Protein backbone atom coordinates (compact mmCIF):
# COMPACT_ATOMS: atom_id res chain seq x y z
CA UNK A 1 0.00 0.00 0.00
CA UNK A 2 1.33 3.41 -0.98
CA UNK A 3 1.66 6.07 1.73
CA UNK A 4 -0.48 9.16 1.23
CA UNK A 5 1.02 12.62 1.33
CA UNK A 6 -0.75 15.81 2.32
CA UNK A 7 -0.86 19.00 0.22
CA UNK A 8 2.65 19.95 1.36
CA UNK A 9 3.99 16.54 0.36
CA UNK A 10 4.40 15.32 3.94
CA UNK A 11 3.71 11.78 5.11
CA UNK A 12 2.20 13.05 8.39
CA UNK A 13 0.33 16.06 9.74
CA UNK A 14 2.04 16.31 13.14
CA UNK A 15 5.72 16.77 12.32
CA UNK A 16 5.74 20.53 12.81
CA UNK A 17 3.93 20.22 16.15
CA UNK A 18 6.33 17.53 17.35
CA UNK A 19 9.27 19.77 16.47
CA UNK A 20 7.58 22.71 18.20
CA UNK A 21 7.01 20.80 21.45
CA UNK A 22 10.43 19.12 21.33
CA UNK A 23 12.12 22.51 21.04
CA UNK A 24 9.78 24.10 23.62
CA UNK A 25 10.88 21.42 26.09
CA UNK A 26 14.56 21.79 25.11
CA UNK A 27 14.80 18.13 24.11
CA UNK A 28 17.39 16.76 21.73
CA UNK A 29 16.37 14.03 19.31
CA UNK A 30 18.28 11.54 21.47
CA UNK A 31 16.64 12.67 24.72
CA UNK A 32 13.17 12.41 23.18
CA UNK A 33 14.04 8.97 21.82
CA UNK A 34 15.15 7.92 25.32
CA UNK A 35 11.93 9.26 26.86
CA UNK A 36 9.80 7.36 24.35
CA UNK A 37 11.71 4.18 25.18
CA UNK A 38 10.55 4.55 28.81
CA UNK A 39 7.01 4.06 27.45
CA UNK A 40 8.10 1.05 25.39
CA UNK A 41 8.20 2.98 22.12
CA UNK A 42 11.40 2.39 20.19
CA UNK A 43 11.94 5.32 17.82
CA UNK A 44 15.50 6.14 16.78
CA UNK A 45 16.54 9.81 16.84
CA UNK A 46 16.82 9.77 13.03
CA UNK A 47 13.21 8.61 12.82
CA UNK A 48 12.11 11.55 14.98
CA UNK A 49 13.97 13.87 12.61
CA UNK A 50 12.21 12.20 9.66
CA UNK A 51 8.83 12.58 11.36
CA UNK A 52 9.47 16.29 11.93
CA UNK A 53 10.45 16.72 8.27
CA UNK A 54 7.36 14.84 7.07
CA UNK A 55 9.43 12.00 5.63
CA UNK A 56 7.97 9.27 7.88
CA UNK A 57 4.49 8.32 8.96
CA UNK A 58 3.45 8.22 12.62
CA UNK A 59 1.37 5.38 14.04
CA UNK A 60 -1.21 5.83 16.78
CA UNK A 61 0.83 4.49 19.70
CA UNK A 62 3.76 6.72 18.71
CA UNK A 63 1.45 9.73 18.68
CA UNK A 64 0.30 8.84 22.19
CA UNK A 65 3.93 8.48 23.30
CA UNK A 66 4.87 11.90 21.96
CA UNK A 67 1.90 13.43 23.78
CA UNK A 68 2.92 11.77 27.06
CA UNK A 69 6.53 12.96 26.71
CA UNK A 70 5.37 16.53 26.13
CA UNK A 71 2.63 16.33 28.82
CA UNK A 72 -0.03 17.34 26.31
CA UNK A 73 -2.97 15.61 24.63
CA UNK A 74 -2.99 13.94 21.25
CA UNK A 75 -5.51 16.61 20.26
CA UNK A 76 -2.83 19.26 20.88
CA UNK A 77 -0.75 17.56 18.18
CA UNK A 78 -3.49 17.16 15.56
CA UNK A 79 -5.91 20.05 16.14
CA UNK A 80 -4.42 22.35 13.48
CA UNK A 81 -4.93 19.65 10.86
CA UNK A 82 -8.63 19.39 11.72
CA UNK A 83 -9.01 23.17 11.70
CA UNK A 84 -7.66 23.20 8.14
CA UNK A 85 -10.11 20.47 7.11
CA UNK A 86 -13.05 22.48 8.41
CA UNK A 87 -12.23 25.65 6.46
For each predicted feature, which ranges?
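A short, Lys/Arg-rich alpha-helix, primarily the initiator
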Residues: 1-25
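Short, charged recognition helix plus adjacent turn
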Residues: 2-8, 68, 75-87
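Residue-level signal for the short linker/turn that defines the boundary of a DNA-recognition helix
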Residues: 13-16, 26-27, 43, 58-61
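Short basic helix-loop element that most often maps to the first helix and adjoining turn
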Residues: 16-38, 65
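Conserved hydrophobic/aromatic packing and binding residues within compact polymer-binding modules
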Residues: 18, 32-33, 48-51, 77
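Recognition helix of helix-turn-helix/homeodomain-like DNA-binding domains
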Residues: 37-57, 80
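Short, basic-rich loop-to-helix N-cap that marks the start of a DNA-contacting helix
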Residues: 53-67
Amino acid sequence: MKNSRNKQGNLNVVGNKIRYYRELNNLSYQKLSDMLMLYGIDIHKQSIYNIEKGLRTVVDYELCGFAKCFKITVDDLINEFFKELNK
